[in-house]
Amino acid sequence: MTMTMNKDSLALIKQSIKTIADYPKPGIMFRDVTSLLEDASAYQATIALFVEKYQGMGFTKVVGTEARGFLFGAPLALELGIGFVPVRKPGKLPRKTIAQSYELEYGMDTLEIHVDAIKPEDKVLVVDDLLATGGTIEATVKLIRQLGGQVEHAAFVISLPDIGGEKRLAGLGLDVFALCEFEGE
């Protein structure tokens, strides 16, 4: 986080995120980013702080992961004046795609991207709402790199540092940034 970021804005963002105990299963503290979206001031502050962080860094595309990554990635791309690329679950993108599977806590999942969405000259910023294990973003980064895109940065509204996603993504050579952290799951 840069020193110029407004502490009041960061506090507003963190306070707007509701925590739901034992959802979706017992023992989980679910961080509900939809409550942030309901607060126009908090949502605007979120996008403004991302713009402050990433403006002027030469990105040519923002990639957002399904589905909440779209809610932060698309407005950020507009503010930066660059294109937005969605990474989606299988069968949701109409043109030719490539796919990357990844492990979930109990099973596997797959993400897809259009084969023509990223070019080798693209410098890509990956955006999602929450970083936990890092599996979704790792799969996203693999897709971008398979298409030749350059990706070294990933931005999140929330990070759960105890779960290990930051370390996992650092192992991929990513600079990880989150507006707020919550301890525990």
Curated annotation (Swiss-Prot):
PROSITE patterns the record matches: PUR_PYR_PR_TRANSFER
EC number: 2.4.2.7
Gene3D superfamilies: 3.40.50.2020
Record GO terms (molecular function): adenine phosphoribosyltransferase activity
UniProt KW keywords: Cytoplasm, Glycosyltransferase, Purine salvage, Transferase
Primary localization: cytoplasm
Pfam family, one: Pribosyltran
GO cellular component: cytosol
Pathway this chain belongs to: Purine metabolism; AMP biosynthesis via salvage pathway; AMP from adenine: step 1/1
Superkingdom: Bacteria
InterPro entries linked to this entry: Ade_phspho_trans (IPR005764), Adenine_PRTase (IPR050120), PRibTrfase_dom (IPR000836), PRTase-like (IPR029057)
Catalyzed chemical reaction(s): AMP + diphosphate = 5-phospho-alpha-D-ribose 1-diphosphate + adenine
Locations listed in the record: Cytoplasm
An annotated GO BP: purine ribonucleoside salvage
Function: Catalyzes a salvage reaction resulting in the formation of AMP, that is energically less costly than de novo synthesis.
PANTHER family: ADENINE PHOSPHORIBOSYLTRANSFERASE, PHOSPHORIBOSYLTRANSFERASE DOMAIN-CONTAINING PROTEIN
Assembly information from the UniProt record: Homodimer.
Family: Belongs to the purine/pyrimidine phosphoribosyltransferase family.
Listed name of the protein: Adenine phosphoribosyltransferase
Organism of this sequence: Shewanella denitrificans (strain OS217 / ATCC BAA-1090 / DSM 15013)
